[in-house]
UniProtKB/Swiss-Prot annotation:
An example Gene Ontology CC term for this record: membrane
Record bears the keyword Transport: no
Segments for region (Disordered): 10-45
Keywords: Membrane, Transmembrane, Transmembrane helix
Protein name: Putative transmembrane protein At3g54730
Principal location listed in the UniProt entry: membrane
Highest taxon of the lineage: Eukaryota
Pro residues: compositionally biased ranges: 10-25
Length: 387
């Protein structure tokens, strides 16, 4: 463990390494990068440091253990206008699980009230026990961002990093950088502040920060490529369904139109009441429902595929004795998971259309027979001239 504390003074002092630093003062990869020679002169302090209080402390804490847990906590009061003060990420083996419960986010927000939020020394600690709590918090994040219009980009990028802590490389490959337009700027500003504090350690800190962001880069790409796609697809599907329900609820409350509450997962209401509509409108009505069921099938296949990993570990704790689940998972892996999902999607779409077409035929027949029966009853029991 390495702990470096720098007290702010009227002129920023230079943090020099000890003449004979112990071998455990820094992690092994950083000791080889830091030179024992005299460091260069520090840069001139920025304008916003002039007149700042001397009571603040800038703390940089780096810790690395054999279990793979990494902790980086930077409390930098250099820019007092930023709402974001520090990010604390604590997790063991990021590349093995979906570590939402072991992440912690710190940012300075004066008026934030939420069950997951606790105040501590002017900062806010956000902790949760499951994915649903985190997802609910960040689903309502726009209402919190409205209080801080100047920091919305920083908070949005931080929330995406919390939801997907270990998929930065996957997000870049999936062209999802559009969701994080200021992601690089945030990292650059944090790295710049660290370099101003510790100019002689800037190379080692940058490399250590990159290792924290992408530990076991090759393993992530090889092992979690398909699982990351499944998680992202499930999130996108859930967001899309939630957005549709929210829009329909708004239509019901504003326009008082109960017909707009009909979910897209089912057929349109006019499809049954108007059996003589054109074939184009009927086919479009089929696709409206089958398209939504397609997303449901895709998410179910993704979750079903991911469920084999914990089941296999429980069924066969000894890797030398493969179980039936391992062979079945390898058989599924022989086929492309994306291809299986697309096939299931098409199957559900055509089954949906075929089912409702087959269901509509007896419905139309019953309506026609009822109409003919009522007409015959009227003709037999009532006279035209009123006799």
């Amino acid at each position: 463990m390495a702990l470096v504390m720098l007290a702010r003074a009227p002129a920023p002092p230079l943090l020099l390494p000890s003449p004979n630093p112990p071998p455990c003062a820094l992690p092994q990869d950083l000791t080889s990068l830091v030179s024992p020679s005299e460091p260069p002169d520090p840069p001139d302090p920025p304008d916003y440091l002039v007149g700042a209080s001397n009571s603040f402390l800038s703390i940089l804490l780096l810790r690395s253990s054999d279990l793979g847990s990494d902790l980086v906590q930077a409390l930098s009061p250099l820019d007092l206008g930023f709402a974001l003060r520090s990010i604390t990420a604590v997790c063991s083996s990021w590349y093995q699980v979906f570590p939402l419960a072991c992440l912690e986010l710190w940012f300075s927000i004066p008026h934030l009230s939420h069950p997951l939020v606790t105040l501590s020394k002017g900062f806010v600690s956000l902790k949760g026990s499951n994915f649903f709590e985190f997802f609910t918090f960040f689903w309502n994040m726009p209402s919190f961002i409205l209080q801080f219009p100047h920091h919305e980009d920083v908070m949005i990028s931080t929330s995406f990093r919390l939801v997907l802590p270990q998929y930065e490389a996957v997000m870049i490959l999936l062209k999802l950088k559009l969701f994080l337009p200021h992601y690089e700027d945030v990292l650059f500003s944090i790295g710049l502040r660290i370099q101003l504090l510790l100019p002689q350690y800037e190379v080692g800190l940058i490399l250590y920060k990159l290792r924290l962001l992408l530990p076991h880069y090759e393993d992530v790409i090889q092992k979690l490529w398909l699982r990351a796609i499944h998680v992202i697809v499930s999130l996108v599907w859930f967001l899309e369904i939630s957005r549709r329900i929210k829009e329909k609820t708004y239509d019901v409350l504003t326009r008082n139109d109960l017909g707009s509450w009909t979910p897209d997962l089912f057929i349109e209401k006019w499809w049954f009441s108007q059996p003589h509509t054109s074939p184009k409108l009927r086919f479009f009505s089929h696709l409206v429902g089958s398209r939504s069921w397609c997303f449901v099938a895709y998410a179910i296949v993704a979750v079903f595929h991911d469920a084999f990993y914990p089941l296999e570990d429980v069924a066969s704790p000894d890797s030398r004795s493969p179980s039936v689940l391992s062979y079945f998972r390898k058989l599924i892996s022989c086929f492309s998971t994306i291809g299986v999902s697309n096939f299931s999607c098409l199957t559900v779409m055509y089954v949906f259309i075929f089912f409702f077409r087959a269901f509509r035929m007896p419905f139309v027949a019953v309506v026609s027979l009822a109409f003919v029966a009522s007409l015959m009853y009227l003709l037999n029991h009532f006279s035209i001239v009123g006799e």
